[in-house]
């Protein structure tokens, strides 16, 4: 992913986290398609998760690696269910938000920095 886009995404997350309820990301594709994405979606409650992600959470086991954890949305839900969770994201602003939201084990890292067998479940939630 483009480092500039990663930074801009993080700025939008921080804007919302710091009180800008109208923060929006504009998704622009190479084919010219554009679509607004309200940043509030990255801060929704577990009751608002899509059914496939609810099912994925129910099927987690043991120590969970939440890849691309963003704002900690799913990490927090897993922690509340008693799981040990390691949340990783390559976006430093997202990592800062997760720390402030009380995700217990947060790392600014890429999945390729981990070796096989360290986790019981690897989640890539959206």
Regions inferred by a protein language model and the residue ranges of each:
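N-terminal auxiliary segments of SAM/dcSAM-dependent transferases
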Residues: 1-27
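Conserved SAM-binding loop and adjacent beta-strand
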Residues: 21-53
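Conserved class I S-adenosyl-L-methionine
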Residues: 61-70
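Conserved SAM-binding loop of SAM-dependent methyltransferases across substrates and taxa
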Residues: 71-83
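Conserved SAM/SAH-binding beta-strand->alpha-helix loop
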Residues: 91-92
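Short alpha-helix immediately C-terminal to the canonical SAM-binding loop
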Residues: 95-97
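Conserved SAM-binding strand-loop segment of SAM-dependent methyltransferases
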Residues: 102-113
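A conserved beta-strand element that flanks and buttresses the S-adenosyl-L-methionine
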Residues: 123
């Amino acid at each position: 992913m483009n480092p500039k886009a990663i930074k801009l995404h993080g700025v939008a997350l921080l804007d919302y986290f710091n009180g800008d309820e109208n923060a929006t990301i504009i998704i622009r594709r190479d084919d010219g398609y554009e679509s607004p994405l309200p940043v509030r979606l990255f801060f929704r409650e577990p009751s608002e998760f899509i059914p496939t992600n609810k099912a994925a959470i129910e099927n987690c086991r043991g120590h969970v690696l939440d890849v691309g954890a963003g704002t900690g949305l799913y990490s927090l839900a897993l922690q509340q269910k008693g799981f040990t969770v390691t949340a990783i994201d390559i976006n430093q602003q997202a990592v800062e938000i997760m720390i402030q939201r009380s995700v217990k084990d947060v790392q600014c890292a890429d999945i390729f920095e981990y070796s096989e067998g360290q986790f019981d479940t690897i989640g890539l939630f959206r």
